[in-house]
Amino acid sequence: MINFFDHINPEGKANIPSKKKPMFPIKEDLRQYLKRYGREVLLPFSYQDLQRFTYTIPLKDKNGKDTAWEQVSYDMREWDFLRKSLVKVYAILKTEGDLSFANHLDVARIDYCYFGNSQPFRIRIVNKFNDNYDHYYIKKADASRIYGLELEHILSPNRITYFTSKDTLIEEHIPGIPGDLFIRDYISAANTNKIRLAKEFVKFNERCFVQLLGDMRSYNFVVNIIPDIEDFQYRIRAIDFDQQSYEGRKNLYLPQFFKDNQALVNMVLKHLDKQSIEQYQAEEKTMMTFRLVSSRYRVKELLDIMDDDQISTDEKITELREALFVHFNNPQYLKAITMGQLLKTHLKCSLRKYLKKMPKTGKHE
């Protein structure tokens, strides 16, 4: 179990990921996996086509403050080509490519983010009849991010729609209140159920560690507030999967150790006792185990592909291997020589207790 009461970073280092993670190419067997599960499609354009903008305008938030986004503009010929293609992509995301609704859809805006490894474009699609809009993202395809998206889709309570086309990645927009804004504007509100929020942060912390999903600083997750009988429930969702099984420091896979999340950690320590924290950790691992068993063949296929994929450096693999060995006191970690092997061992060690309790027959078989 992860100890929330030991929330000070024992490694003596600032809990900050590497400033620049390299982009790892999608190897052929991962590409075949994506095709088998309907994740690879043929697009009429690529990420590189979107880079041919002519100028940008900085975007500000509703309070007039600068954001990391810029609105981009294209020459007329380029814009006409992109508009049709981007509406088609939206149809693929939402209606399996049914273009019968495309006539009342249009591209309202394209934004570019210069911050982050994937340098995403955010596409705003608008319904011309009622002005309702939606977003999706176009990024550089990266093997780390693909593994993170797949693991989140399979092991977490959240389904994710995305697809690839060669070196281009299309991701749906994950709605919610950005974590940093939630901490700033909502966490102290009188109607915030702090016990339920603390419970969800414990579960989110556990999911990230079991999946080895790193860098969950507050701007890399969103919070959903769900009305429930007489109160609210909360769901914290990761929105950035760039740091899947890349970093060497164990605490980078634990949201509780990021300074940005200190207010959530304090809430856990104030409202939950040790037994309650352990209960919620066990609940989350049990549900992850159900999902793992239900999708065991797909998970095995993915982990076998990840097994020999080079998605980190030898130094980081060695550092994480040693840290997990010390944490679990399990020599099985010392046999791993890739991040994929480490993750496979980590899933077994984290969920073995719960796997033993799974029924051998029935709906989970």
Whereabouts are the PLM-identified features?
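Regulatory N- and C-terminal appendages and interdomain linkers associated
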Residues: M1-E96, D314-E365
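A general structural signal for short secondary-structure junctions and capping/turn motifs
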Residues: H7-I16, M23, C113, K128-F129, ...
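Short charge-dense sequence patches
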Residues: K27-L42, E70, A91-L105, L151-S156, ...
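Conserved ATP-binding subdomain of kinase catalytic cores across diverse folds
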Residues: Q48, I57, G64-L181
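Short C-terminal domain-edge/linker segments immediately following a structured domain
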Residues: H153-S156, D167-E172, F201-F204, L254, ...
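AlphaC helix of the protein kinase catalytic domain
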Residues: L181-S188
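Conserved kinase catalytic-core segment
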Residues: A189-K250
